[in-house]
């Protein structure tokens, strides 16, 4: 009797089968949940789930789908608007005092715009000269404000115009190779300043040729005199013995003088930056090729645990190359400590949510 009781199961067989099926179902469900939790890289961000009203990390529209003017850099658009305002006000002011400006004149509005451009770019031919106290004070005000505006144009407009030609130059230098968009971006990133120098030099040569041809064809200058006038204009020397005298010539000069003088200044700026970049690359090459010593390992051990990890080694190398300094690292670490709400030494979704909650409460 006792042996039969021992062999008899405590639960019926059907009950055991049902429990086993439930256990298998729960185990599969929990394992699938674990798998879903491990796939954190593809999961939605916690801050998106926390606040649905805030749109974060929306991809910007593709540049090809944006109108041309809206594709411009906001700073460049602002400079263009200031330039248009400057030329409008300057033309109006110099037109009103046109009787107080002596020299060879053609049309009132064209002469006023031409004098405004010549003043802003500091070319100063001398073919139009203010001859009264009011006109001279006005010219002084516009020459200083114009130099400031030209400085902004140097750093904004020339970059925009040159970058449009960089991809074409890469294709031209590699005509025999199959260069796709990825290869072009990689090549531009590697030799960005070099291609900027090439593009600016090409634009400058075109402007020299166009200016010389125009002076020969329209202003009826000899070739040498036309080239001399182009050089004195682009370099803003403006001796004054050769200049634009016709109405069509001065209208052409309004656009040509501004473009060519800015282009030349930007070319020299790119050359200086290229020399600096070459020195920086030489330093990087030296850092990457020299052998690591024990002193280097001690300096790279940021947490002083006797072991240098990949992150510590990368930070040390970047500091040695001059890419970052101690201030950059301390600033990033301060941000990390602020986000690490539970002080675990790692960042999780809950840390970000708690940090956002705290910042919203403080507001």
From Swiss-Prot:
Pfam families: Ion_trans_2. GO terms for molecular function: metal ion binding; monoatomic ion channel activity; potassium channel activity. Residues 288-323, 327-362 form the EF-hand domain. It is found in: Vacuole membrane. Residues 111-130, 225-244 dip into the membrane without crossing it. The keyword Cytoplasm does not apply. GO terms for biological process: cellular response to electrical stimulus; intracellular potassium ion homeostasis; potassium ion export across plasma membrane; potassium ion import across plasma membrane; regulation of seed germination; regulation of stomatal movement. InterPro entries: 2pore_dom_K_chnl (IPR003280), EF-hand-dom_pair (IPR011992), EF_Hand_1_Ca_BS (IPR018247), K_chnl_dom (IPR013099). Residues 1-61 are annotated as: Disordered. The keyword Transport applies. A motif (Endoplasmic reticulum release signal) lies at residues 296-298. Ca(2+) 1 binds at residues 301, 303, 305, 312. Could be activated by protein kinase C. Strongly induced by calcium. Blocked by barium, tetraethylammonium (TEA), quinine and quinidine. Phosphorylation at Ser-42 increases and stabilizes the interaction with 14-3-3 proteins. Keywords: Calcium, Ion channel, Ion transport, Membrane, Metal-binding, Phosphoprotein, Potassium, Potassium channel, Potassium transport, Repeat, Transmembrane, Transmembrane helix, Transport, Vacuole. GO terms for cellular component: vacuolar membrane. Disruption phenotype: Reduced growth in both high and low K(+) conditions. Slower germination and increased sensitivity to abscisic acid. Reduction of the total tonoplast current density. Residues 31-42 have a biased composition (Basic residues). 14-3-3 protein binding is not involved in endoplasmic reticulum export and tonoplast targeting. Belongs to the two pore domain potassium channel (TC 1.A.1.7) family. Voltage-independent, large conductance and potassium-selective tonoplast ion channel. Regulated by cytoplasmic calcium and pH. Does not mediate slow-vacuolar (SV) ionic currents, but essential to establish VK currents. Has some permeability for Rb(+) and NH(4)(+), but none for Na(+), Cs(+) or Li(+). Involved in intracellular K(+) redistribution and/or K(+) retranslocation between different tissues. Homodimer. Interacts with GRF1 and GRF6, but only GRF6 modulates the channel activity. This is Two-pore potassium channel 1. It comes from Arabidopsis thaliana (Mouse-ear cress).
